[in-house]
């Protein structure tokens, strides 16, 4: 015991820090007792008691929820939580729903922890108390099955209600009525509106098998109100519908005007044109432009009517004729513009809404949409109409042109004319032209419209002879358009002309209802005889008459228009020539563009297609003729110029112009044969075959020589690749001449330029003679060559030159014929004689040109690229047109003659360069005659002398560098981005040209023959023009050489009889094929005609444009490029 005690005492001391291991109870007892430690003893005692309590069972009374008392026994060691589970299980209760309350013997609540053993608590009663159920959410009610029921009411309204399908309709009625806002007392439930039998309200929806009801308010007032509301709604709907229809119509009309480049045929019906134009508008024109043009569209059906024209006078400037005339006779333009605008009325009307729009989008050939019917009738009806009324005929022609909405140039032309009218100043006109050039799309559409009308009027002519003539018309229209609008409208006209000679033909028919040729001659002579005002009318009328004369001479007619316009404008041969040169130069440049249309298509769509080239070329020739005629007869300067222009306007006219007395003969001759085309039609027809456009460009050289040269260097690859580019409808219609023509033109130009330099030095007569000889050989070949630009490559020097010379003779011959015609019909006959061996060839060429024209028109490959280029260079084309117009104004006044001389010299110098660029060649070639007259016309030094030759574009062609400089200036003036501004053809273009030449040999042989026929006359004219221009007449050889150098460079070396003609012919042939869009060619021609008046006024300011052309060949190319592209 003693031993134990000390141990326990020590132990507790030791274990206190731990305080966990109590001593054994016995020992503790003993220890506690012995030690008498109260704490230790008490603790030990409590623990012992607890242990004893835990070890034993405990009896409990359990109070269940229903105050049911149950007794149970549990082991004292069971924790309280376990006790709850145990009791709930014993009495089938949910432990989660109950809690345990403990009561002691004294009925006190005992607090416990869930893990406290029940034995340690002095528990007497356990109460199972349910937890607080109030906090719980009430159990969800099972949803009642419902269905969706559609309730129709008030005829047009419906609502949806969800109701029980088993409930009777009587129970559902209040719900339905409240939903429909009806009075349940006056509401009937029907199966549907038609059935008047009310439903049985005692049945449920399931019983009726319905899920849709009609609730009818039987109240009279509500019924009446509902009926009235329905009526009012119907009226409102109708009103809205009609309003939308109106607005839609307006939109469509507006859209149709700008978007009818290729929709010209659909133009007759607003719906068609609108629908077609809409996409175009959205793509090419701003929505505002269409809106503004909406108003003009209604007049478009009466596009021929003067009031409509007057209404659109300001817009009409795009149609160069009115404006150029207006420029000379400031206030004569309203009527004139009306006339001119008749063709491009819709175009101008569409552009009228927006001056800016007008500038940028003269394309809305709204009038053309309505003229398609005219186009078919124009051949017979318009011819009679236009000769009768100077204004109405032109209006008819232009209305026809607008009909052909597909030609955007028309719009631009209209705009140009309008602006020219407004400004009435040559300097102002160039600005307008620049503006118009920027709105190239508008200009082009208008020209295209004219061409389209011409094509429609004379589809056959457009194809063969018409191909060249169409080019002439295109040239004329482009001249007008370019005078006023720059070159854009011309290009469109060219395209349209290529596609359709109807417009010009219509004009011709109108002018020459009974006897197209004679009427043209007579009217042409009569109008030229009149004063400037009369000339204005004469130009328009003559243009129309010429149109009548030229189904085949559609181009001539258009040329006549510009020429007359120019003559009228300047009042003197020089002034007129300047204007004509401005117009002619523009077309010529455009013609050059088609030659290098690939190069210049974007920049100038002046010669969208070969017809456009022809138109320009013929225009150029006409210009030359008129200038020459004016040179010969200063007294008859204006009238003679006018008649010359009229004569030259049509292929016959060019012939007629050579000998005014012989005008009728020649007019008919060109119509029947390509011999007249040789003088003028030849220029135009062959230029289409042989890229007459270059000749036209030469003609334009005065105003737009740069275009031509630039056009030469600017044979665009696309043009070269696809020689048969057709202007797109929606686009500004920059028609890209098929690559073959362009390549051929390039090759021809390069070679022709070389030959031109060499052969240009040779007497033009030699060139003429050689051309006749070569034309004989080459026209056979060049028929194929014109057909396919490949031939020029093989015959690059002989045939391309021949073609070029052919083209130049076309260009020069036309002027020469014009000169000879005024001077003597014999020279014209000599020309023809020179080309006599080719007179049949001309017919062949006409046939070939027709076939080529068709093939080009059918050539869809060129179109895409052309369209793309058009889109690309649309603005530039507009600028080009404006620049052309400006150039026309500036060039004649400042120093056209000097420029012409410089150009001639430069032409001789850049011969190789121009040879490289067929465009330049053609322009040079064309400008030769025009240069001769460009001195007078552009320089205004020898108005009588130089006024006749419309081939004055030579100055532009002459200096390649000068032309480039001017081209740059022109481009700057135009503000048109020129995709291709190369002064020479690109290697690709050359390659294409070579390949095209190889193909063209076979295809364009007949066209080549035609071209050859033309070149002699052109050469003579070119000679005469050169003499007039440089040495008046003494230096015919030298001047001719210079002019021919430029002319040949532009017209692929007109001076070189042997090589030049071949080259020219090939180029012309290719040009003819390039103008595959007759409508656009037509419109280009119409635009040229329109711009003729504007050009006449612009001619005074033409020197700047000439300078641009001469100094900046590339610039001219730039300007031409858009038109060329436009044309193609």
UniProtKB/Swiss-Prot annotation:
Phosphothreonine sites (modified residues): 139, 260, 284
Keyword check for Phosphoprotein: yes
GO MF, one example: cadherin binding
Pfam families xrefs: Cobl (PF09469)
Keywords, ordered alphabetically: Phosphoprotein, Repeat
Record's compositionally biased regions (Basic and acidic residues): 475-488, 899-908
Matching InterPro entries: COBL-like, Cordon-bleu_ubiquitin_domain, WH2_dom
CDD domains reported for this sequence: WH2_Wc_Cobl
Polar residues bias locations: 270-286, 345-357, 397-415, 1045-1081, 1103-1122
Motif KKRRAP 2 per record, residues: 360-365
Motif (KKRRAP 1): 291-296
Modified residues (Phosphoserine): 204, 222, 256, 273, 326, 333, 344, 356, 438, 441, 461, 471, 474, 563, 584, 786, 813-814, 821, 911, 917, 947, 1069-1070, 1121
PANTHER family to which the protein is assigned, alphabetical: CORDON-BLEU (PTHR21557), CORDON-BLEU PROTEIN-LIKE 1 (PTHR21557:SF2)
Protein name: Cordon-bleu protein-like 1
Species of the source: Homo sapiens (Human)
């Amino acid at each position: 015991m003693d031993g134990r005690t000390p141990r326990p005492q020590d132990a507790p001391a030791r274990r206190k820090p731990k305080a966990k291991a109590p001593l054994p109870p016995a020992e503790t007892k003993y220890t506690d007792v012995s030690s008498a430690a109260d704490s230790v003893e008490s603790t030990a005692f409590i623990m012992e008691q607890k242990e004893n309590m835990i070890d034993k069972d405990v009896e409990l009374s359990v109070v269940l929820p229903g105050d049911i008392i149950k007794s149970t026994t549990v082991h004292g060691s069971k924790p309280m939580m376990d006790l709850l589970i145990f009791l709930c299980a014993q009495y089938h209760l949910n432990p989660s729903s109950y809690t345990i309350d403990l009561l002691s013997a004294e009925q006190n609540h005992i607090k416990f922890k869930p893990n406290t053993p029940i034995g340690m608590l002095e528990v007497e009663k356990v109460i199972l108390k349910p937890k607080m159920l109030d906090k719980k959410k009430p159990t969800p009610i099972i949803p009642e099955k419902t269905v969706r029921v559609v309730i129709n009411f008030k005829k047009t309204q419906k609502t949806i209600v969800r109701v029980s399908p088993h409930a009777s309709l009587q129970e559902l009625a209040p719900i339905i009525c409240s939903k429909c806002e009806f009075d349940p007392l006056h509401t009937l439930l029907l199966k549907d509106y038609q059935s008047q039998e009310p439903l049985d309200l005692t049945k449920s929806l399931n019983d009726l098998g319905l899920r849709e009801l009609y609730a009818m308010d039987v109240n009279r007032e509500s019924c009446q109100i509902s009926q009235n509301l329905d009526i009012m709604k119907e009226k409102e709907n109708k009103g809205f519908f009609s309003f939308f229809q109106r607005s839609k119509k307006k939109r469509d009309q507006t859209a149709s005007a700008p978007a009818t480049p290729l929709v010209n045929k659909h133009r007759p019906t607003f719906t068609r044109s609108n629908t077609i134009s809409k996409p175009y508008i959205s793509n090419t024109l701003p929505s505002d432009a269409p809106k503004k043009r909406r108003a003009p569209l209604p007049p478009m059906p009466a596009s021929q009517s003067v009031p409509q024209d007057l209404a659109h006078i300001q817009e009409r400037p795009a149609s160069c004729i009115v404006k150029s005339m207006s420029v000379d006779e400031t206030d004569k333009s309203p009527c004139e513009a009306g006339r001119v605008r008749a063709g491009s009325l819709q175009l101008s009307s569409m552009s009228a809404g927006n001056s800016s729009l007008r500038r940028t989008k003269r394309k809305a050939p709204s009038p053309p949409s309505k003229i398609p019917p005219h186009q078919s009738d124009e051949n017979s009806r318009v011819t009679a109409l236009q000769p009768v009324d100077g204004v109405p005929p032109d209006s008819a022609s232009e209305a026809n042109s607008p009909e052909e909405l597909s030609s955007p140039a028309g719009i631009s032309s209209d705009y140009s004319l309008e602006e020219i009218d407004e400004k009435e100043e040559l300097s102002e006109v160039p600005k307008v032209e620049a503006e118009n050039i920027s709105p190239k799309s508008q200009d082009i559409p208008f020209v295209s419209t004219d061409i389209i009308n011409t094509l429609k009027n004379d589809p056959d002519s457009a194809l063969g002879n018409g191909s060249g003539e169409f080019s002439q018309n295109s040239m004329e229209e482009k001249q007008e358009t370019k005078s006023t609008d720059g070159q854009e409208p011309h290009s469109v006209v060219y395209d349209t002309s290529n596609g359709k000679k109807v417009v010009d033909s219509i004009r011709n028919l109108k002018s020459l209802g009974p006897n197209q040729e004679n009427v043209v001659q007579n009217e042409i002579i009569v109008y030229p005889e009149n004063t400037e005002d009369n000339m204005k009318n004469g130009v328009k009328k003559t243009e129309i008459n010429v149109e009548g004369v030229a189904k085949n001479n559609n181009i001539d007619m258009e040329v006549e228009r510009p020429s007359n316009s120019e003559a009228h404008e300047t009042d003197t041969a020089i002034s007129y020539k300047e204007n004509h040169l401005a117009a002619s130069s523009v077309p010529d440049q455009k013609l050059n563009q088609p030659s290098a249309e690939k190069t210049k298509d974007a920049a100038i769509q002046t010669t969208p297609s070969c017809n456009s080239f022809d138109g320009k070329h013929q225009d150029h020739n006409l210009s030359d003729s008129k200038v020459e005629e004016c040179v010969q007869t200063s007294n008859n300067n204006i009238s003679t110029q006018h008649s010359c222009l009229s004569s030259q306007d049509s292929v016959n006219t060019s012939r007629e112009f050579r000998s005014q007395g012989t005008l009728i003969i020649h007019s008919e001759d060109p119509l029947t044969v390509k011999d007249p085309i040789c003088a003028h039609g030849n220029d135009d027809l062959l230029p289409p075959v042989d890229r007459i456009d270059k000749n036209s460009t030469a003609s334009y050289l005065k105003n737009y020589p740069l275009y031509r040269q630039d056009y030469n260097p600017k044979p665009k690859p696309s043009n070269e690749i696809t020689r048969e580019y057709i202007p797109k409808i929606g686009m500004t219609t920059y028609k890209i001449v098929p690559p073959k023509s362009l390549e051929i033109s390039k090759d021809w130009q390069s070679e022709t330029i070389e030959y031109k330099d060499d052969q240009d030095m040779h007497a033009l007569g030699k060139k003429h003679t050689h051309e006749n000889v070569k034309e004989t050989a080459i026209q056979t070949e060049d028929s194929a060559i014109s057909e396919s630009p490949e031939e020029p490559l093989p015959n690059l020097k002989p045939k391309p030159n021949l073609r070029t010379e052919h083209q130049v003779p076309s260009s020069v011959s036309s002027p020469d014929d014009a000169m000879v015609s005024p001077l003597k019909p014999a020279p014209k006959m000599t020309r023809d004689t020179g080309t006599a061996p080719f007179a049949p060839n001309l017919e062949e060429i006409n046939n070939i040109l027709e076939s080529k024209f068709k093939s080009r028109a059918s050539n869809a490959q060129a179109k895409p690229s052309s369209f793309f280029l058009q889109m690309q260079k649309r603005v530039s084309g507009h600028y080009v047109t404006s620049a052309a117009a400006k150039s026309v104004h500036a060039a004649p006044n400042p120093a056209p003659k000097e420029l012409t001389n410089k150009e001639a010299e430069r032409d001789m110098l850049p011969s190789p360069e121009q040879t490289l660029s067929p465009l330049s060649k053609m322009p040079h070639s064309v400008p030769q005659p025009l240069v001769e007259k460009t001195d007078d016309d552009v320089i205004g030094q020898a108005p009588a002398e130089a006024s006749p030759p419309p081939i004055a574009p030579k100055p532009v062609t002459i200096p390649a560098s000068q032309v480039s400089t001017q081209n740059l200036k022109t481009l700057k003036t135009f503000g048109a981005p020129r995709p291709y501004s190369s002064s020479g053809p690109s290697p690709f273009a050359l390659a294409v040209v070579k390949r095209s030449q190889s193909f063209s040999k076979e295809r364009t042989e007949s066209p080549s023959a035609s071209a050859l026929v033309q070149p002699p006359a052109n050469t003579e004219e070119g000679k005469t023009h050169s003499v007039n221009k440089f040495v008046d007449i003494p230096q015919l050889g030298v001047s001719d050489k210079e002019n021919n150098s430029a002319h040949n460079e532009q017209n692929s070396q007109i001076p070189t009889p042997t090589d030049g003609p071949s080259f020219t012919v090939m180029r012309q042939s290719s040009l003819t094929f390039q103008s595959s869009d007759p409508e656009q060619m037509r419109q280009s021609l119409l635009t040229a005609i329109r711009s003729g008046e504007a050009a006449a006024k612009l001619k005074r300011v033409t020197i700047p444009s000439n300078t641009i052309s001469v100094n900046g060949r590339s610039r001219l190319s730039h300007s031409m490029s858009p038109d060329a592209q436009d044309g193609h």
